[in-house]
Each structure stands twice: as C-alpha cells, then as structure tokens.
Amino acid sequence: STLSKAAGIDIADLTFNSQEEELSQTKNTQIAILAMSLGILKLLEEKNIKADYATGLSLGEYAALTYAKSFTLEDVGKIVKKRGEFMQNLLPEGDWAMAAVIGMEDEKIEEVCKKVVQGFAVPANYNCPGQVAVSGDKAGILEMSEIAKEEGAKRVVSLKTSGPFHTEKLVEASKACLLYTSDAADD
C-alpha cells in the first residue's frame, strides 16, 4: 500500500503477523495505529458515512489531518514512522509506565500526583470528565495509584505503553519531530 511504501515497512505484515514484542515497540505501534485509524475511516466512507470535521488526540491528529486531506498518505507515512522512531530512540532510559485514573476530579488527580515521592507521576491527558491518563516511571505510577485509590478514585487502570507519553521526558523527540517536519515542509 501507499502508506507501507512511504513508511518503508509492510504494515499489514507487522500488524497481523509480528510478535507482540515487535508490534509494541513505539516505532512500530505508531504506524500500525495510524494505518488502522485510516482503514476504519475508509470503511466508514464505503458505507457512505463521511465526517464533516475530524479531530484527534496525539497520534489521532495525524489520522484526522490525513482524512481532511491536509497530509497525503505518502507524507503522513513518512512523518509518523519518523515520529515513532524519535519517540523510541530519544526517550531517556527508564522504567516507564502510564495509568488511567477513573472517577476522580482533575484537580484531585493533580494533587495526588504532587504527593508522589518515589519517582514521578504527572497528568498526561485529560481524556474526559472523570478520566485522566497519568504518565511517569513505574515507581511513581504505583505510588500514585495507591494514593488515588485511598483518596477516592473508582479505578486505576494500568496502560500498556512503553513510555511516559505526553511528559517532558519526550521533549527531545518532540524537537526532532518538529525539525524533521519543518525540513520536509521546506522541500
């Protein structure tokens, strides 16, 4: 497919035939999620369901922008593949984790994160009222989870991720991605 050629990887093979360890590497997960998102949008269009507007969170922004024809498949394939590589390769070494805190006010979750003394935990995504994703290292997320439950969270769900996404730990990856996309726009 066009997306696979642009990314330099057989996305269908990666998604359906690779081992979990390979697919869960950020450099592979990013492009696989993009392909699935775009595939779902294509299926909806085939059923005559077309959005007037599209938006996305984090990686979802790339699918939304492609759906809106702001990116070509060639461009988004290259960009998202590089983005995943930057995220994986420029993340500092660490034992990272994320969790979703459910049933607690945003401000309370922020207070809970400030109480963490073993490692770090910070609110990463305010997903919807009553649900916030928190990123950090495993020790910080474990401590945050215990405090959140003690202070009234309905649930804390561990998220299967390889990094503390949406935190300052990915600043270098963000800078590299910005430079890459700026250079691509100049070409």
Role assignments for model-derived ranges:
Residues 1-111:
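FabD-like malonyl-/acyl-CoA
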